[in-house]
Amino acid sequence: SNITFINIHASILPRWRGAAPIQRAIMNMDKETGISIMKIVPKLDSGPVMKFEKISITNECNYQTLSKKISLLASSVITESLEIIENNNAKFIPQDESKATYAKKIDKSESKINWNDKANQLVAKINALYPNPGSWFTLNGSRIKITKAKETNNTGKPGEILDNRFIIGCSHNSIEILELQKEGKKNMSKTDFLKGNKIKIGTIID
């Protein structure tokens, strides 16, 4: 009866309960996330929490880099937490249900880029979905994943190629593609891509 089942969840609960907490935190442009060590209860990710550790989310964080940081954080905290439980010093604090948000599983349909989004939202989404399933658009009939991009303040129509540096208009500002991957090809820099692929300023891409 004195066995405690705990779980490490990759968010600061009750924010982002559910299947994709790291991706949703990046996509939502949260400034921080972390881990919660909680007691397992029947309802999803809603058990009382004994420990939080926070970590900041920078503009450079993508799913791959942030999940690595979170794993390292978790492995450093779990030993200490188990000792606290073993010594009967664990205090489990109930979560505030009114603050709960849900990180629903990433759906494949989310990976298609919508140029009507704002540039900062698109960059966040590209980072959140890297490396899988990735964020893609189509150019000359082939599907291209954007693996790295940054926001720029050029303005133009959503989806319009504004500059030969591969800057594309969004509903607010624009993004500059820095790295990308054609279907069946390796990830490459924009410079390498543009050597073998012509882009025409003024073209609207899907």
Task: Spell out what each predicted region is.
Residues 15-19, 115, 186:
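Alpha-helix N-cap/helix-start motif
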Residues 27, 41, 103-105, 136, ...:
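Short secondary-structure boundary/capping segments
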Residues 31-34, 45-46, 51, 107-109, ...:
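A generic structural signal for well-ordered coil/turn residues at beta-strand boundaries
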Residues 104-117:
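Acyl-group handling in specialized metabolite and lipid biosynthesis
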Residues 116-206:
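An anion-binding loop in the catalytic cleft
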